[in-house]
């Protein structure tokens, strides 16, 4: 048995003031792809040959430049064309929240182009992030599609391996099935879908119960993605039957799950405490019990924001007689990074931190001591899946 493996991951925030280009992607071709995806062992355990295709990962980013996407899509499809006569199936990891200029969803476009080449019957399985958008055409052209259960996505590697195992079993048993899709008229943000909180915890428990049915192979609830404008935005339900004769039964289960989620629509809420910036600052200053974590949700780089806001930093710098030790997460400023990269560890330097792109990213003058330089890594669970460049840790003097 031979299965082609490819991956395209981009989460497109249309508010980001830049286009995602080829240099923004981690690109891998060859056997290293399997290790980075965390799926090498499953193929060895099942005695199945994985044909490594192409991997492109920009993580959370912006609208993708069309030429960049065309290149990536071409590389993924080239691998399939080169091995089409020996393939028993295709496994793809597609995030689901990409948006390409002049095209729309890159994920959907890739699958449509692949189906033009291999036809409607070659088994294709997709693992994906639940924060992606679906359509009936996209889902039902797949034999299997499975999203992560957990948010944060601590089960990402587990889900990829599970999806591959489902594909292998499907190929071995020669069942002609396809995934079933239901659309929900519901749009949610990631902060409203934390899996340790209700109602997502109950939804996941219900899906686990549904999968105990021998007629059902896989069940997924897809939260959707709302940070770019597209007609397919919103929640979706996917159910995959174990056998062709259970296809209609899967339709019923999809309706049941759709109703279950819909009936909980008023339970969705923002997890955690939220406050306006001035109130949040005061809460942090007055907290004397334990470490206080304050996040600027409007500058969330894991959703494609720029990461260059200095607003909260300037709030703390304006506090007179500050009695607390404050650790700031990364602030993006490539010019200041280059300046600090030239000096030695423990050396001091005067810097202007801030990109001055707008009012929120105004620069501030700081006298700092360089402490450390290291990679900024991206982790899913315990698996390092990529890097986001390098960062420099400094101590503000005075």
Where are these regions (language model features)?
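Conserved anion/nucleotide-ligand pocket segment
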Residues: 160-208
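Gly-rich Lys/Arg/Thr-decorated short loops/hinges at beta-loop-alpha junctions or inter-strand turns
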Residues: 52-63, 93-95, 257-266
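Low-complexity, highly charged intrinsically disordered N-terminal segments
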Residues: 47-51, 55-68, 72-80
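Glycine-rich phosphate/diphosphate-binding loops that line cofactor/substrate pockets in enzymes
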Residues: 1, 45, 52, 78-88, ...
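Generic structural signal for well-ordered alpha-helices
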Residues: 77, 111, 164, 281-284, ...
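N-terminal amphipathic/basic leader segments beginning at the initiator methionine
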Residues: 1-46
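Active-site histidine-anchored catalytic micro-motif
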Residues: 4, 8-11, 15, 66-73, ...
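Hard-cation-handling environments
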Residues: 191-398
């Amino acid at each position: 048995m031979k299965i082609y493996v490819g991956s395209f991951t981009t989460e497109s925030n249309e508010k980001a003031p830049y286009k995602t280009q080829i240099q923004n992607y981690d690109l891998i071709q060859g056997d290293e792809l399997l290790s980075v995806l965390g799926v090498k062992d499953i193929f060895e355990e099942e005695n199945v040959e994985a044909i490594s295709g192409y991997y492109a990962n920009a993580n959370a980013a912006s609208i993708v430049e069309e030429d960049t996407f065309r290149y990536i899509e071409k590389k993924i499809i080239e691998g399939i064309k080169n091995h089409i006569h020996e393939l028993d199936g295709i496994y793809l990891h597609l995030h689901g929240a990409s948006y390409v200029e002049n095209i729309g969803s890159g994920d959907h476009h890739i699958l449509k182009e692949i189906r033009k080449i291999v036809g409607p019957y070659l088994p294709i399985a997709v693992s994906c992030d639940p924060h992606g958008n679906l359509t009936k055409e996209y889902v039902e052209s797949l034999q299997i599609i499975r999203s992560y259960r957990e948010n944060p996505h601590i089960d990402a590697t587990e889900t990829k391996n599970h999806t591959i195992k489902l594909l292998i079993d499907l190929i071995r048993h020669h069942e002609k099935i396809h995934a079933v899709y239901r659309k929900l008229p519901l749009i949610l943000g990631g902060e409203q879908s934390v899996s340790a909180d209700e109602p997502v915890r109950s939804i996941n428990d219900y899906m686990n119960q549904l999968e105990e049915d021998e007629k059902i192979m896989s069940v997924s609830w897809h939260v959707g993605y709302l940070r770019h404008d597209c007609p397919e935005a919103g929640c979706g339900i996917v159910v995959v039957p174990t056998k062709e004769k259970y296809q209609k039964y899967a339709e019923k289960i999809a309706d049941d799950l759709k109703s279950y989620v819909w009936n909980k629509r008023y339970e969705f809420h923002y997890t955690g405490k939220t406050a306006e910036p001035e109130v949040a600052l005061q809460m942090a200053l007055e907290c004397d019990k334990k470490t206080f974590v304050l996040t600027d949700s409007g500058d969330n780089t894991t959703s494609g924001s720029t990461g260059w806001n200095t607003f909260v930093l300037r709030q703390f710098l304006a506090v007179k007689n500050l009695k607390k030790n404050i650790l700031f997460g990364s602030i993006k400023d490539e010019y200041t990074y280059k300046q600090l990269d030239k000096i030695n560890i423990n050396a001091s330097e005067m810097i202007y931190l801030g990109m001055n792109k707008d009012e929120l990213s105004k620069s501030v003058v700081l006298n700092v001591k360089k402490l450390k330089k290291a990679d900024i890594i991206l982790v899913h669970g315990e698996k390092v899946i990529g890097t986001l460049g390098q960062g420099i840790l400094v101590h503000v003097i005075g």
